[in-house]
Amino acid sequence: MEHSLYPVPPRFTVRRLVLMDLAAICTLYGACGRDAAWGTRETLAALFGEGEWWGGFLGGELVVCCACVPARSATPQAAALRGALAPARLPARFLLPPAATPEGRAFAGRFLSLLGERLWPPCASPEKRLAAAVPVKTGGLLLDGFFEAGFTLFLVRPLAALRPHYLLTPPGLRQPAPGTPNEDAVRRVHIPLADTLAVSRLLEQGFCGTALYEGADGQPALRLERPNPA
């Protein structure tokens, strides 16, 4: 019998979580520091009654997870997100800040893409509009996964304990006009990701964050885009 010289990589799967997964969820959030201080065992358990928990498993181990709740949910997390958005921009649901192991961060894009097939398909109707939140201080490694899955960054706002969060929307909900714009139709700006104030100001001016890349200094930089006036 012939054997491969290379180990088979562990399989990555996504499924809806149940209350029996609570201990693993708590472990992930417990390792996220102050940005996840809101994630007490009681709070995380309560979210099972308010919405849905989803997780990504690598070789059977939970490595990334997040909760999706209705925007009108009574949870403090949903209330904080509602307060950060104007009524006209309020979506139907919120994807609360995720938690992941170092291995799970590398699978964040795949996790969100698979999750999107279930929760925000490309032809999503208005009642399926969604906004996701990612903490600025510790979420940078996850942010790349959101961009990989097609999300767009549109705001930076203080949320839990006044800590700033990125707010993003998934693909299919902010579609550009048909056709490929020429270079003159879109203005592009590149800003160090660490310059949160500059990023926030550009987002307020109508720019959207679309990608992360490594800058000349080796630090993460954010690409922002805005259509030029016709």
Residue spans for each PLM region:
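Short amphipathic alpha-helix that is part of the acyltransferase structural core
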Residues: 2-42, 50-57, 62, 184-188
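Conserved acetyl-CoA-binding loop-helix of GNAT-fold acetyltransferases
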Residues: 100-120
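A short helix-loop-beta-strand connector motif used in the catalytic cores of GNAT acetyltransferases and
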Residues: 45-64, 69-75, 210, 217-221
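Conserved acyl-donor/pantetheine-binding loop and adjacent beta-alpha core of acyl/acetyltransferases
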Residues: 65-99, 103
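Terminal substrate-recognition subdomain of acyl/acetyltransferases
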Residues: 1-17, 121-230
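Short amphipathic alpha-helical segments and helix-helix/interface helices
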Residues: 44-45, 112, 143, 199
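A general structural motif
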Residues: 51, 88, 125-129
